[in-house]
Amino acid sequence: MTQGSRLYFAVAVLMCGFVSINGVGLNDLLERASQLSDKLHSLSTSLTNDLDSHFPPVGRVMMPRPSMCHTSSLQIPNDKDQALKVPEDELLSLARSLLLAWSDPLALLSSEASSLAHPERNTIDSKTKELQDNINSLGAGLEHVFNKMDSTSDNLSSLPFDINSLGQDKTSRLVNFHFLLSCFRRDSHKIDSFLKVLRCRAAKKRPEMC
């Protein structure tokens, strides 16, 4: 079994785990969510490596700054120590807000991947569709976590994404695809970190053990 196949199988198992959710405790829900968010970050890293294997030098010059990511306006903890000070319901809202913010961008990436000017476009196309499917599964799982936590706050931030094209020429499209993916990879790491803090708190571990 290849690395990609193992990753796909692991994520598929986790997705199935969210289907039969009745009677599952909060600790187990957060464990499943943390595992899935970890797989998503691994998949986005693998995709980035695929793109980097044949990325034009001019693309590095054309790449927008990270501050141009559409989620950069969201005020979030910068590290684990800060995240440990954020209330549980607020931390969950941040993770859910980031997931929702990637619904449209991932749909755009999924629609563009198969026509990229890149020799690995078939692999990139397949992995991008996996990302889109799996982030939807994680979003559904976090809805169950929200309900299980009996939170009174459902304050989700709106992070609009108004782009419907990656560009007209092949280089621009490849650069913008890479840029969006780099933004997602950054955000998937944040989501993974937030969920691991929530999992640690649910297990009543000491902060220094998280």
Swiss-Prot record:
Subcellular localization(s) per the UniProt record: Secreted
Molecular function terms from GO: hormone activity
Principal subcellular localization: secreted
Keywords (A to Z) from UniProt: Disulfide bond, Hormone, Secreted, Signal
Ranges that cross the membrane: none
CC per GO annotation: extracellular space
Taxonomic superkingdom: Eukaryota
Disulfide bonds: C69-C183, C200-C210
Signal peptide: 1-23
Known tissue expression: Pituitary gland.
Classification via InterPro entries: 4_helix_cytokine-like_core (IPR009079), Somatotropin/Prolactin (IPR001400), Somatotropin_CS (IPR018116)
UniProt GO BP: positive regulation of cell population proliferation; positive regulation of receptor signaling pathway via JAK-STAT; response to nutrient levels
Record-linked Pfam families: Hormone_1
Annotated family: Belongs to the somatotropin/prolactin family.
Name used for this protein in its record: Prolactin
Native species: Carassius auratus
Gene name linked to the record: prl1
